[in-house]
């Protein structure tokens, strides 16, 4: 059986970025995903400006731009039906220019990413679901799973990277997930949404919040995040529409608009992950933990975590060392860089569900801009 240098589980932004990174460093990489691409995902489809340099380094930014994605100037926040406060991205200290963020449908982004991975020479196994690991002593040394024909397969590797998201096989195998705040997100694309300007519009009001942003071609992505308890036996589409239209600011934007696809949902938002208990295995992207989507940082954090992991994995190959202790450097670096963002996410959760404080902060921000 062929032994790859690295097997990557998951073909989302984190997994594709990881595969491209290691391929560019000269390693023999395989990537497995249980889906057939293109496929869709529940996502804000909003990529913060910090991702642009990473996408360019990976060689995919020009291809994304060719899709004619929407470029957003920042966010516009409404607190409990108040007028939106528009917040532009700050001017870059390096370029002196004000950056913008990409807004592009996930089914387009992920399909483009995977095509780039295939073109780079990575061996891609679509419709291959990884269900377990191969072990050599206390280190992961490959994967087992099933293909689309329910035929078992095995791939051996010197290292495995799990980019399988919030339901990653590593989280289940080693019981690593520490459940968070019980949030659930609903999303769908709409046609004809009336957005005043090129911002991601965030509306905070009970029982949750929404993010609305154009994704180009006359369509907008409308995401609702609420506590799981808000469902209370209701159908997802009923809850989604009722909550959207219960806010006068959203209602104005959605008046005359049409939902053009079924409402999708995803649970287990905002969770933490315990350390990996063995060597030969690295987790990247949402598999390493998921912060609340209100921050709009999810895809950037996935890309950046893969970039950090690539540096540590490269050092592991140079030292022929994939022990748990050696690879823990990645966890430390990730925490050092992202720790403040995770803290901010927790603070935001308290803020947006505390109406007087949320209104007070928005009023203070508005006053400071005058």
Could you say what each language-model-derived stretch is?
Residues 93-115, 231-235:
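Short beta-strand to alpha-helix junction loop
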Residues 67, 232-313, 318:
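FAD/FMN-dependent oxidoreductases across multiple families
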Residues 1-12:
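Beta1/beta-strand and adjacent pyrophosphate-binding region of the FAD-binding site
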Residues 116-254:
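Predominantly flavin-linked oxidoreductase catalytic cores and closely associated redox partners
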Residues 42-81:
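N-terminal FAD cofactor-binding segment of flavoenzymes
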Residues 15-16:
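N-terminal Rossmann-fold NAD(P) dinucleotide-binding loop
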Residues 23-43:
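Glycine-rich FAD pyrophosphate-binding loop
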Residues 314-370:
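C-terminal helical "tail/cap" subdomain of flavin- and related membrane-associated enzymes
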